[in-house]
């Protein structure tokens, strides 16, 4: 959703559901656990609090292959199944931005972290373990 980066979530069930998608395709699925600590004032962090016009524009730009942020990390809602359906309809031109935002306003964002700077990864992220699902 936020372009190239190292993606994390603090929601265990969300991570499991995402990994299980690989299992359904006949691939191995692993759940990696990390310790992630950062001081927000030391990093450029772009945060989206809701599925709003700014989030929709940023995701649209990233999905078009354009990198528009120099942030060390982007934080915001992940596109779950219902959100993906709305995005697909919006990108296909089936619904307007206003209609998409009207549908998205009822969704509570499941937060994801997209670390986009190698420096932040090396300074703030520590591997703990892996578990095969």
Per-segment meaning from a language model:
Residues 1, 16-17, 21-133:
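Conserved NAD+-utilizing ADP-ribose enzyme module
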